[in-house]
Amino acid sequence: KRFTEDALRIMRAVRFSAQLGYEIEPETKAALMEFAPKLTCISSERIQAELVKLVISPHPENLKIAYETGITKVILPEFDVCMETEQNNPHHCYNVGEHILKSMQKISPDKVLRLAMLFHDIGKPETITMDDQGICHFHGHQAVSEEITLKILKRLKFDNYTIGMVTKLVRYHDYEVEAKEKNVRRAVMKIGEDIFPLLFQVKEADLEAQSTYLQEEKKEKLKAVQRVYEQVAAKGECVSLKTLAVTGKDLISEADMCPGPEIGKVLHQLLDIVIEDPEQNERENLLK
C-alpha cells in the first residue's frame, strides 16, 4: 500500500538495505517488482537523490537488488545490459555488471568516485567483440562509456560539476602513463590537475574488481606512477597555464603581440617547453 502512495518508496527500500546492511524480505521484494514500473511517474531529480544515497552507502553492491526487482530497468536500463554482458577474458572474473558492483565497493564513499565506478564500463556492451580464441575485447569502450555517462547524468539532472568530474574520470580510467616525470607532467596537463590524482583511486578500485591475472604487476605499475606524480606535485612543477611564468598580458606588453587566438597558441607552445624542462619556467626565459 505504501508503494502505491509514493513510488519513490520502492527505491528507498533498496537504499535503506544498502545503508543499514539488512536483507529485504521475499514479500517486500515481490512488491518492489510489482510496483517498480510506477517509477516512471517520479521526477528525475528525486530519482537522482535516491540513487546517490544508494551509491554512497556502505553497500553500493545492493544496486543488484534494484536490478533483480526491475528498478534499474526503469531508472538505469544501461546497467541492466551490463548485468547481461559476459567478459570472457583472462583479466576478468565477473560479468560487466558484477565487475561494476565490485569496483564500487572498492572505492571510498564519495559521490563523484562512486558514480565514476558505476559508469566506467557502461559502454562495454556496445563495444564487445570476440576473437578466434573466444576471448572478449572491448576496444574503445572508454569513449563510448563517457558518451553514455553524459546522457545518463543529464537525464537524471545532475549538476554540471558532477557531470564534468565523472565523465572525465570515465574517459581516462584506462589511460596509461609511463612512470617518468616528463610523462606524468604531460598526463596531468592533458587530464587536469583536479582529475589526475583521483584516477589512482579509480584505477585501483578497477583492478581490485578484476581477476588475479597479472594483478600484482598492474598494481605495482600504478604505484610507480603515483610515486612519480607525488614527486612532481611536491616540487610544484608547472603542469598547466595557471602556473606558467608568463600570461597573455605579458605577451601583449613585453612581446608586442596583438590580442587574439595567437596568444593562446603561443602560451600552449611555452607550456610544452616547460613540461619538457620545468627549469625553463622563468619569465625572462619564456619571453626571449
Where are these regions (language model features)?
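Glycine- and charge-enriched loop/helix tracts that form the active or gating conduit
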Residues: 1-118, 122-140, 144-157, 261-266, ...
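A ubiquitous short alpha-helical element
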Residues: 1-2, 33-36, 133-137, 188-190, ...
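Charged, alpha-helix-enriched surfaces in structured cytosolic catalytic cores
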Residues: 5-8, 46, 98, 161, ...
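Short alpha-helical linear motifs
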Residues: 51-56, 90-91, 187-194, 209-210, ...
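Short, motif-level signal for alpha-helix interfacial/capping segments enriched in acidic residues
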Residues: 97-101, 185, 225, 235
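Divalent metal-dependent catalytic cores for phosphoryl transfer on phosphate-bearing substrates
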Residues: 103-218
